[in-house]
Amino acid sequence: MFIVDVIKKEDATGELKSLYKMIEHSLGFVPPHFELFASIDIEAMKEFAQYNFKMMSHAKIDKNLLPFLRLEIAKRECRSYCISFNTQMVTKLMDGEKLPSDASQKLLLEKVLKSLYETKTFTKDDLNSLEKSGISNRDFYDLLSYASNFMAKSKMIEVYLKKEA
């Protein structure tokens, strides 16, 4: 799958084994790209995992919105691995639903995507519409940061994927 050797969950020892257990406890499994990141830089992977756990328990952002956001970005950025992985996550976590039904969550997703892909047209009016729906500037910032981090990580995954000859 990757052009470098990774330490699989079943082969991990010590600190890495503990990290994998924490990830598995939270997600139910250890994604292959987490094994990739942890095999290269365990400290960075710990920070990445903690950040993801924090976002999954965000007070105002529905954790079920996250895989939809990642999938939409992966499609727009042509990230094959992330499209496949997040399609599976959406199917598993959401049981086939399109999006969380809360209107403020849909608006938040829309505005984060607009801020990333239509930056020149993103204005204070967009932030005001979020505020009117109960989403603070901090909540928007948190999801925008998450999305930006995902864009970087998805690119790193593509770099390390085995390419077909």
Protein language model regions, located:
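Hydrophobic alpha-helical segments
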Residues: 1-165
